[in-house]
Amino acid sequence: MRRPLVVGNWKMNGRSASVARLLNDILAGIGDCKAEVGVCVPFVYIPQASEILKGTKVMLGAQNVADHNSGAFTGEISAGMLREFGCELAIVGHSERRLLYGESNELVASRYEQAIQGHLKPILCVGETLEQREQGRTLAVIGAQIDTVFEFAGVQSLEHAVIAYEPVWAVGTGRSATTGQAQEVHYHIRSLIARWNPEVAQAVQIIYGGSVKPENSAELFAMPDIDGGLIGGASLDARAFLSICHSVSV
């Protein structure tokens, strides 16, 4: 039985005071939440967040991870460095990284591999643009993104990873995929993995990201192949994020 997972991606938001307030509000309201819960904060706030979350049920994550473990790579932060400060999760391949910073499938796969080797759980983001969807290429695009990761790290690595489907046209736009659209792609992703390893396919958590909010989370999470959410804007509001966390069904 796959346990639901809800992860907040704070993106480039927050100041020290607001980080403390938001994390403490989340901890105060998390209670007997049935889902696993995590937050991916900006790099500079990871030490602060680590102190606040230490010993709690909320996992700490980073929003990216380097594709090398050390060396002359200015501005990069390795999996080992993140682990040292208490990180358990790391987002890789977010659509904003792919689109705004030109990260290729190969670079994303290398980051994913480094996360696995550094004992972080990567959240591998995959998804299509609106143009690709309208061209009927959704499944081919996502298949290529996932296959590249398997070439680098193998399908067995998914035993220690999460996949997040985030349709690019729904990220930060207020426009979400319908439950039917999301379930269709999640089912396809699981079927694609099953071609490599059926047991891994049934075990891996596949979560949805793309304008998830309290108004639509329960319906999305009720779908058989949607195991939770990667939450953007709504994760910056403790009440909204907690509502989403508590909307999971098990």
From Swiss-Prot:
What highest taxon heads this organism's lineage?
A: Bacteria
Q: Which reaction does it catalyse?
A: D-glyceraldehyde 3-phosphate = dihydroxyacetone phosphate
Q: In which pathway does it act?
A: Carbohydrate biosynthesis; gluconeogenesis; Carbohydrate degradation; glycolysis; D-glyceraldehyde 3-phosphate from glycerone phosphate: step 1/1
Per UniProt, the keywords (alphabetical) are: Cytoplasm, Gluconeogenesis, Glycolysis, Isomerase
Which Pfam families would you find in this protein's record? TIM (PF00121)
Q: Name one GO biological process term.
A: glycolytic process
**Where is it found, in Gene Ontology cellular component terms?**
cytosol
CDD domains xref list:
TIM (cd00311)
Name the EC number(s).
Answer: 5.3.1.1
Its primary localisation, in coarse terms, equals: cytoplasm
Question: Where is this protein found?
Answer: Cytoplasm
Residues that coordinate or bind substrate: 9-11, 172, 211, 232-233
Q: Where is the active site?
A: 94, 166
Which GO MF terms does the UniProt record name?
triose-phosphate isomerase activity
Concerning its family, UniProt says:
Belongs to the triosephosphate isomerase family.
What task does this protein carry out? Answer: Involved in the gluconeogenesis. Catalyzes stereospecifically the conversion of dihydroxyacetone phosphate (DHAP) to D-glyceraldehyde-3-phosphate (G3P).
Question: How the protein assembles, per its UniProt entry?
Answer: Homodimer.
What name goes with this protein? Triosephosphate isomerase
Protein species of origin: Methylococcus capsulatus (strain ATCC 33009 / NCIMB 11132 / Bath)
Question: Could you read off the lineage of the organism from its UniProt record?
Answer: Bacteria, Pseudomonadati, Pseudomonadota, Gammaproteobacteria, Methylococcales
